């Protein structure tokens, strides 16, 4: 998990530079292996990191934290830019939903990224939550370390 997130952050480095952002990856362990579909998790975290960059404030940072426990890994991605209004938080994982103030041509997007992210987390038996206030917007993903990957869990991502 640490390696995957580190690689995704490195790949996104040009985007960080373009937005005048920095990033910080923190983990309580140097390595954590979980049973999961690596391609889907890469898609999930690439989306969350991309959104943190897109909506991050110029000159601020994106903080990625990994908290590994015996049977659960928690990943939080925080940006210190745009605050999502509280009334919009319950809707943010709906397909085609875009936060009203982010619907500009400069940010782009279809409103599918977070819906797909939630489907990926659900397929892995995990949870995804968001909080947003003046202290930052935080997406928190919790995944089981030893998830039973079988065909019933993995369907088509719509």
What are the residue ranges of the model-derived segments?
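Conserved catalytic submotifs in the C-terminal HATPase_c
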Residues: 22-32
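Short conserved segment of the HATPase_c
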Residues: 84-96, 155
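Short alpha-helical Gxxx[C/S/T] motif in the catalytic ATP-binding
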Residues: 108, 113, 117
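Short beta-strand/loop element within the Bergerat-fold HATPase_c
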Residues: 59-71
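A conserved beta-strand-to-alpha-helix junction within the catalytic ATP-binding
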Residues: 1-10, 24
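Short helix-loop "hinge" at the ATP-lid/N-box region of the Bergerat-fold HATPase_c
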Residues: 52-53
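Conserved glycine-rich
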Residues: 125-126
